[in-house]
C-alpha cells in the first residue's frame, strides 16, 4: 500500500529559546555499550545542549514530528527535530519541506539533470514526492539533529 498523500503528517514548530543556561554534567570518557562504570567518577565539566545543537540561533527551530514516513531513518512519531533555516540544503540532506500547502520531513535528492528533485520517505508504505516548477515547493530548513526519547 502506497500512501501518496500525507495529510496525517503534522509538524509543530518551536523557536529555539536561549534564556538561562542549563548546564548538564559531561562525562570525561565516552561510554562503551555494555561496559558498566560508576559514571560520577568521570565527570569532567558541564555542557549546555544549545551550544551543541544550535549553530545559528536566529534561524534554528525545534519541530515536533508526527507520522511514520521516516521511521526507517530512525525518525519516529513524537521525535523532536532540530532544524536550521540558514543552512543551504544539499543533496541527501534530511529537510523540512513545504509542498503544495503541506509541511513534511523527507530526505532531499536532486535529479542528475538538476531540473527536478525528490522528497524521499524512509518507509516503504510511502511514495517519493517529485518536486519541480509545477509544485509550490520550498525547503523550509535542514534537519541537523533528531532527539528521540528512549525511556519515560
Model segments located where?
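Short polar/acidic secondary-structure junctions
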Residues: 54, 86-88, 110
